[in-house]
């Protein structure tokens, strides 16, 4: 390994040239790697949720829907808004109470089930159906267009709106927190290193490694937005130690081989590789362990981060040594006294009183266990987003106006008898958290023949399945 290290040291310009050239395919790879915002796509195919979504897309031609609350608007204007929504690409349909009742009818004459679902005082609700899945690009583009059409009296809620806001936040804030992480690392390195130039070389080397890792994601075809958001910061934190180890080894070998910097770097590369391989293998193994998760998001993150660690090690023993040798003179000229030059006294104190420290950490273990067992875990992704976001404002408005913030579509076999359907509906209505249920039979009665069902009502009944809507208040479900 020493021979390889010496070869890298001698051909440092070649190493840097290769490193610069690799930026080109990396940038192309990043541009062509799709970012997946659909968490459902990472669920196993055998789950009912996934099966249901596939049926919705394949047989009903829809996979996502949004609830739209409209306040203080004349019914004719709401109807015009409905028609505008229907013209938006990838909007499969818009359901409102005018599909089953004339808007000229007094509110009191509208069937109770329809009135309860679509009208509450000065507020009314529409259901917008998309022709693609919840987090698809098509659905998010359609929702963005709906928001542009809607005025201040309209509030569009639903998972597609949440995902759209997450996408916008991620694209806006990702560069910001990566820069913050880099600046914080730079401050720490400036305090702990002996040269003002070295920290910049560390960040440049790791930055290239991150770029290569993100570019190589093209082999996966796509990565989740969570993986994309975490990769840069995680890789920076995980691989920084490798760079520090190389520099320390180089400084020691310079004393061992005075005036022979290439030889010193060759030995430093060999020593670093031998030491880093062990720690990096355990790190890679930890990330690979994520790949066994049934939830495939773990595999996505595990592969990308394991790949990032390997690339980080390679850059640490190729790109970084070349940078240090090329910028050797600036490094020497900008040397300064270590701000944290002597840690002997704190380490001696800890070593001398090790029993006290053991007892202290054992005592701290008790509140840690208690805190872990009593920390509530939330699964509503909207709770992690700012309350001022369009999606959360709309969710709150729908909840305030209609007492609910969540809706589900239940699909039944077309050949299911009316009696069985009614029995099932009654049981579902009794479930805690279910606010109301609307189905074909609840709108027109179970005894009405198919031939007499109005076209606008019949369109929600397709092929081998019937659809039924359940409106729920998730906060009532425990």
Please give the residue ranges for each predicted region.
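Structured non-transmembrane domains adjacent to transmembrane bundles in polytopic membrane proteins
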Residues: 45-65, 70-163, 386-478
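Membrane-embedded transmembrane helical bundles of large multi-pass transporters/channels
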Residues: 1-35, 41, 91, 134-379
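Membrane-proximal, lumen/periplasm-facing interface regions of secretory-pathway glyco-
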Residues: 37-45, 379-388
């Amino acid at each position: 390994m020493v021979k390889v290290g010496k070869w890298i040291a001698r051909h440092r310009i070649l190493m840097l040239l290769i490193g610069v050239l690799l930026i080109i395919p990396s940038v192309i790879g990043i541009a062509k790697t799709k970012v997946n915002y659909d968490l459902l796509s990472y669920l196993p195919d055998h789950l009912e949720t996934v099966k249901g979504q596939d049926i919705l897309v394949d047989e009903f031609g829809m996979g996502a829907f949004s609830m739209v609350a409209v306040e203080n608007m004349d019914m004719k204007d709401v109807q015009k808004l409905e028609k505008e929504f229907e013209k938006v690409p990838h909007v499969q349909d818009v359901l409102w109470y005018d599909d089953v009742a004339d808007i000229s009818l007094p509110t009191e004459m509208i069937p109770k089930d329809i009135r309860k679902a679509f009208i509450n005082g000065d507020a009314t609700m529409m259901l917008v159906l998309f022709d693609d899945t919840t987090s698809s690009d098509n659905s998010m583009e359609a929702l963005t267009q709906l928001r542009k059409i809607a005025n201040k009296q309209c509030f569009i809620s639903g998972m597609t709106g949440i995902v759209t806001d997450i996408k916008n936040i991620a694209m806006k804030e990702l560069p910001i927190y990566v820069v913050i992480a880099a600046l914080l690392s730079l401050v720490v390195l400036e305090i702990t290193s002996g040269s003002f130039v070295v920290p910049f070389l560390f960040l440049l080397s790791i930055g290239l490694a991150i770029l290569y890792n993100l570019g190589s994601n093209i082999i996966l075809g796509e990565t989740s937005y969570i993986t994309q958001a975490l990769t840069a910061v995680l890789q920076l934190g995980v691989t920084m130690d490798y760079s520090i180890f190389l520099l320390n080894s180089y400084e020691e070998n310079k004393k061992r081989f005075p005036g022979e910097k290439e030889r010193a770097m060759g030995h430093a590369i060999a020593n670093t590789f031998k030491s880093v391989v062990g720690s990096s293998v355990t790190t890679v193994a930890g990330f690979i362990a994520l790949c066994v998760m049934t939830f495939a998001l773990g595999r996505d993150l595990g592969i990308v981060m394991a790949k990032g660690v390997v690339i980080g090690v390679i850059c640490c023993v190729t790109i970084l040594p070349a940078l240090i040798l090329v910028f050797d003179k600036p490094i020497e000229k900008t040397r300064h006294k270590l701000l944290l030059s002597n840690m002997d006294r704190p380490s001696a104190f800890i070593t001398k009183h090790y029993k006290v420290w053991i007892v202290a950490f054992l005592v701290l273990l008790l509140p840690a266990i208690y805190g872990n067992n009593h920390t509530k875990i939330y699964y509503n992704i909207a709770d992690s987003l700012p309350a001022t976001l369009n999606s959360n404002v709309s969710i709150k408005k729908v909840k305030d106006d209609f007492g609910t913030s969540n809706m589900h579509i239940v699909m039944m076999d077309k050949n299911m008898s009316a009696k069985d359907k009614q029995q099932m509906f009654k049981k579902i209505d009794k479930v805690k958290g279910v606010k109301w249920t609307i189905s074909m039979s609840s709108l027109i009665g179970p005894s009405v023949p198919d031939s007499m069902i109005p076209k606008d009502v019949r369109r929600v009944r397709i092929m081998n399945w019937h659809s039924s809507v359940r409106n729920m208040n998730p906060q009532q479900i425990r």
